[in-house]
């Protein structure tokens, strides 16, 4: 009997062990898990909320540093927080700023669009120094000349005017252009690159006897680098020796007007017997480093009324000399960029 009782107890225990949970037990489990998840996740979400508040406070504090009004800062914050992870980039990075401007214009609120010019001026993005590439058609200077291509016809043109929404291009030749047509504008930015962009004509009107087309601004702007390396403007005294094919050497002095790791521009008063392909030796000092007998080749020359300028390609630049020039240009870029952001240029 005892054995039978023990067996019955074992069977009953097994049934209890393998039976499904009751509704009450399931509910209790859900409550316990929910409480556990809440306890674990609450600090995480709280920290995220505090982080968002901190980012927003820092953003508006930085906006006040640039004298933005509360309305201007609020409009900027509204769009920049959906554009980049670090909203403060809009105060430093012009490409980010132009993306935000695009979003404001696309939204089409006239009251917000009116604020862009004031914000742009306060952030010192109204114009670009020559060494910073264009990132939007808004960066193109008024009176910039170029070529407009419409229906495979090339027409000389220039930027007549611009605002935050539109670019106005005046045509220098008579040609019929209609709203809705696709056009391309090509232009050369001095000491920088060749640029082009495509657009759809929004409006056409006549001003002063010329046809003016209106296109929307775009950040889809193509850039073709003019040179392999950055060429930096300088004003340094230079002595040079021209090595003529007949063995004659011509010594002269002038001014180094720009330099890169690939070459330089040298200008001097008057004229000399020079032709493209002539070899030249340069002596000058850059960043406390003296370049002695730096060999180059004259690749082009421009003769003005009272002076001559030579484009020179370096032939035998040592690693040390290349490092000195490269470091000089990098430091000058940083200094000029800082001065630009501080409103000094």
UniProtKB/Swiss-Prot annotation:
Cellular compartment(s): Membrane
Top-level taxon of origin: Bacteria
Transmembrane segments: 24-46
InterPro entries to which the protein is assigned, alphabetical: PilZ_domain
Gene Ontology CC, one term: membrane
Pfam families xref list: PilZ
Membrane protein topology class: Single-pass membrane protein
Entry keywords, A to Z: Membrane, Transmembrane, Transmembrane helix
Residue span, PilZ domain: 225-330
Classification via SUPFAM superfamilies: PilZ domain-like
Entry GO MF terms: cyclic-di-GMP binding
Protein name per UniProt: Uncharacterized protein aq_1917
């Amino acid at each position: 009997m005892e054995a039978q009782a023990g067996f019955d107890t074992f069977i009953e225990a097994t049934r209890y062990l393998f039976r499904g949970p009751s509704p009450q037990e399931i509910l209790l489990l859900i409550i316990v898990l929910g409480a556990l998840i809440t306890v674990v996740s609450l600090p995480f979400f709280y920290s995220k909320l505090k982080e968002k508040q901190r980012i927003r406070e820092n953003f508006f504090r930085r906006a006040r540093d640039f004298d933005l009004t509360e309305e201007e800062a609020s409009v900027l914050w509204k769009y920049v927080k959906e554009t980049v992870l670090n909203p403060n980039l809009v105060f430093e990075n012009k490409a980010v700023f132009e993306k935000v401007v695009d979003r404001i214009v696309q939204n089409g609120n006239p009251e917000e669009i009116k604020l862009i010019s004031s914000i742009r001026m306060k952030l010192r993005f109204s114009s670009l120094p020559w060494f910073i590439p264009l990132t939007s058609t808004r960066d193109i200077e008024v009176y910039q000349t170029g070529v407009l291509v419409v229906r495979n016809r090339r027409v000389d043109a220039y930027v007549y005017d611009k605002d935050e929404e539109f670019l106005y291009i005046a045509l220098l030749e008579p040609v019929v252009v209609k709203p809705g047509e696709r056009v391309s504008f090509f232009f050369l930015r001095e000491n920088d690159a060749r640029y082009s962009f495509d657009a759809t004509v929004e409006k056409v009107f006549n001003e002063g006897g010329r046809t003016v087309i209106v296109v929307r601004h775009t950040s889809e702007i193509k850039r073709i680098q003019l040179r392999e390396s950055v060429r930096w403007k300088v004003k340094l005294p230079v002595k040079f020796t021209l090595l003529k094919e007949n063995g004659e050497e011509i010594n002269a002095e002038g001014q180094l007007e720009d330099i890169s790791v690939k070459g330089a521009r040298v200008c001097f008063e008057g004229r000399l017997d020079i032709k493209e392909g002539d070899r030249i030796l340069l002596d000058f000092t850059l960043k406390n480093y003296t370049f002695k007998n730096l060999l180059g080749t004259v690749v082009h020359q421009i003769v003005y009324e009272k002076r001559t300028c030579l484009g020179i390609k370096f032939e035998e630049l040592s690693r040390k000399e290349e490092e000195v020039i490269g470091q000089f240009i990098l430091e000058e870029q940083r200094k000029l960029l800082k001065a630009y952001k501080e409103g000094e240029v």
